[in-house]
Amino acid sequence: MEERTALRELAQGGVLLTCRALESGWPARSLTRALRAEGWARLQSGAWVEPGRAADPPTRLRAVQLLNPRLVVSHRSAAALWRIETLTPTTEARLEFIDPALSFRGKVKDVRVRRTPLESGDVALRYGLRLTSPLRTVADLLRSLPRDDALVALESAVTYRRVGGARRAPLVALDAVMAALASPSQGSARARRWLGLCDPRAGSPAETVARLRMADARLRPESQVQLFTPLGRRVVLDFLFRREGLAVEIEGYAYHGTREAHRRDVSRFNQILQCPEVRSLLRFTAQDVFWNPDRMTAEIRAALLAAG
């Protein structure tokens, strides 16, 4: 009996292609029995994930790319790999690819393939996957996404951010994005107009959307304002309506559940109210920003009117 290569040895990044196992000498019937007996999970037709490995987006991307090597991970899928924030949770988004050969005609569930050319500088390698570069990724998102989502991605990419528990440096420069959008491709003209709304100082997706909602309501505060308390302590506000002395703070999704975190929050807000420029303070959660923006802007407007 011919000795067979172990299935795990044939896997690539935890993904086994059926065709690879068959080519190595596994009979089809024996292969199916072995996959089920060992606990492999089917990702899609022709691809399996090894036992104990989650079928997460990177693993699913790998399966699609192994089956279709010419495809390049792109758009929101590439953004997630570069740790560029968007408004769509990675687990809910379709897998997105570009086919630079313009020849892909297949259909895969929960996968979108765009047929468009790519320059050599548009493609990078990360985690063993071929994907669009940060610059190309941001340009594609600006061309294809709605305004708020596009600007969340842009502002995430041009500044330092903590994403997934790790801090990363800026990935692109704003002038490089502007140059990348200079060509007359679909969506570029609209994207160039949106560049004027970008604030590289934004610290989170919630801050980006809050600022856009305020702008839509004709409320235009200063953002990321540095102030000092009478004791010389530095405080950076999310937003400040300086004439009215109104500070606006946006809290992220993370729940500060520890006693020490709560103490720091209380101390920070006390320090804000000690600043001579601040006479009142409004705090909103990310949920307020995303789900009740009209109420948020109404409260801000009422506070501004009360301040005279």
Where do the protein language model's features map onto the residues?
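Short gly/ser-rich loop at a beta-strand->alpha-helix junction or flexible surface loop bordering the NTP-binding
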Residues: 1-187, 308
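Surface segments flanking catalytic/ligand-binding clefts of nucleic-acid enzymes
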Residues: 1, 12, 25-30, 161-308
